[in-house]
Structure formats: structure tokens, C-alpha cells
Amino acid sequence: KVKVFKTQIILKELEKKMIGKICGTGSYLPDYIIDNFKLAESVDTSDEWIQERTGIRQRHIAKKETTSYMASMAALKALENAGTEPEEIDMILVATSSSETVYPCTACEVQKMTGAANAVGYDVNAACSGFVIAFHTAQAYIHSGICRTVLVIGAERMSRMVDWSDRGTCILFGDGAAATLIKKSQKLFFSYLDSDGNEEVLFSKRNDYLKMKGQDVFKFAIKAIPL
């Protein structure tokens, strides 16, 4: 009941102010591909097993591309798709968990590579939900009037973080980037975010590679968001 009431208040407030709409999109995928049959040569799995559980047939792998390069290529395509010049961008938000450096952030690299001289940029690190949270953040900046045009990018180079002998993770992840250009609009937009840091599924021992409790995550997800 509290969440419903909170939602009603937010909707009423949104009706009074500007909000953002997607005006352009772009993406980038590396050329090198590893399909399920190739994976089955090194781990105990099969194309049928992977597709049945994930729907994934293949994943793109960055051999030379960096996270910032893939993000920039996707961003330039989004700008072209929207018919917008880089100088018009007020903010760049990059959702990533696999940046090459801690500092500078990937968003600053994208600013340089795209020529978005007037934009401020920073990264959002929220794993699988990163792009959604970055998109929601962009809406907040537009809603407040601080920004008029925001570039939101999701970019990952997960292949360098995955243990390719771990069937629980190597079948799921690949590399690539996607970008959306968001501009102010009077159309209504609403989203709701929630976090739960109490679940045991969130915790694992520190490791050199990405680790994930897939079954536990799945069970938590369908409990939190009923199908």
C-alpha cells in the first residue's frame, strides 16, 4: 500500500514537469563470435542446454576493442540516428562494470572520442541493472531542468572477467555496447526502482573472475518480479 501511494504521488508530480524521451539509438558489437558449439568444446555443455535455459546462441567477444571504444561507437550511431550534434549533449552516463581504468571514468573517454565538449560525464556501476538505473538517472536530470539532452550508454567487456571454464558464467556473457539519446519532452514517463541488500545471493568470496549464483539469482528475481 505504501508503494502504491508513493507511485501516485510521483505520477502527479511528473505531470507538472518536463521528462525525457528516446530520440536516437545506436549499438556496437565486436566481429569475433563464440557460438555455443565452440563453448561445448571446452566446458560440459551443449547448444541445446544453453538455448533451453537462456535463449543464447552466440556471444560477441572484443579482441582489441576497449569498453570506452565500444561505448563511443554506439554513442556516435545514436547521435546520427537522432540527428544531433555532439556539442548539444549536456551529460553522458555510462553504465559499466568493466571499465579499463578506475580513473578517468569511461564516460570521460566517451566525451573525448565523440567530441561532446559541453557534456559532463560519469559512470554508473550497478551490474545487470546498470543501464536501467542510468536511464532513470537521466530522466531525473531532465525532470529537474538541469539537463536537456543526455546520452545514456550501456557498455561491457565481460569476456576478460569471465572464467571460461565456469559453465555457470561463461555461457551468459559477451561484449558490446548500446546507446540512447534522451531529450526533454512533455510526454509522461514513469519508472520504479527498488533494491534489496539483505539477500544472501548477493554475497560471494572474492575471486579473480566474475562469480554468480545463477540459480539463486533466478529464484530471487521471480520472487521479486512475479511472471
Each model region followed by its residue ranges:
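Short, Lys/Arg-enriched N-terminal segments with co-localized hydrophobic residues
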Residues: V2-K17
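Short glycine-aspartate micro-motif
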Residues: I19, M91, R148-V152
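Conserved catalytic cysteine-centered active-site region
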Residues: Q51-R53, R57-Y69, S97-V150
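Flexible, glycine-rich active-site loops centered on histidine and acidic residues
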Residues: Y141-G174
